[in-house]
């Protein structure tokens, strides 16, 4: 009820003060579990997308939005789900709540980048989006949003009116038809996520960079890769027939 009331109040304002153009709305199924995966340019993305989609959209939003009273009331009122970017139990709980919504035939909105990127490029997607889609066996509609960074630059509290905003919805993707229920296979999750990010890049017109938008996530990825490289190096050295101390000095 609160969601519908807020939407009814804000929709006329949206169309009055912002030059919004929506393309591909016909690609959005009107029933059944649906996951909308979109690039993230500004805080107001979570305002524009629900207002142009007929169905109720429950967004998986970063937990920081629920820590300030300035944004807490809005996200709670419209039933959004807080996602801790640190991962672990809190993140699994958020994905579990989102899965329940999808399995009950609802619509979830998610930003695979995990946060707003520091520049205008599309950054590497986190695999939770693929895990969620495969677990729910639902369709994924990629979406590209343009212009919201100009409407609300990073750090800006107020929206700048009369700026053009373009939202494009792509064709639905059925990951389950391609990967079945292999949601515990990290290679499958990575490939499926990259497929989604490719479609988002096509729709948003952004250049893609194979790097996480979050510094913490990127640091963790680099540490994981470094550890993997270290393990390979140790295995290589141990397999050599020559003196190991000499081999280590040669490979350093």
Show which residues each predicted segment covers.
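A secondary-structure boundary/capping signal
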Residues: 24, 39, 61-62, 79, ...
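Membrane-interface helix-loop junction between the first two transmembrane segments
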Residues: 21-31
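Residues at the C-termini of beta-strands that transition into short coil/loop
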Residues: 26, 63, 84, 144, ...
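Short gly/ser/thr-rich secondary-structure transition/capping motifs
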Residues: 15-22, 90-92, 149-152
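Catalytic core of membrane glycerolipid acyltransferases/transacylases, capturing the structured
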Residues: 6, 15, 29-90
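A generic structural signal for well-ordered alpha-helical segments
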Residues: 13-15, 74-75, 101, 132-133
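Non-catalytic C-terminal accessory region of glycerolipid acyltransferases
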Residues: 92-252
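N-terminal membrane-anchoring alpha-helices
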Residues: 1-19, 219, 243, 251-252
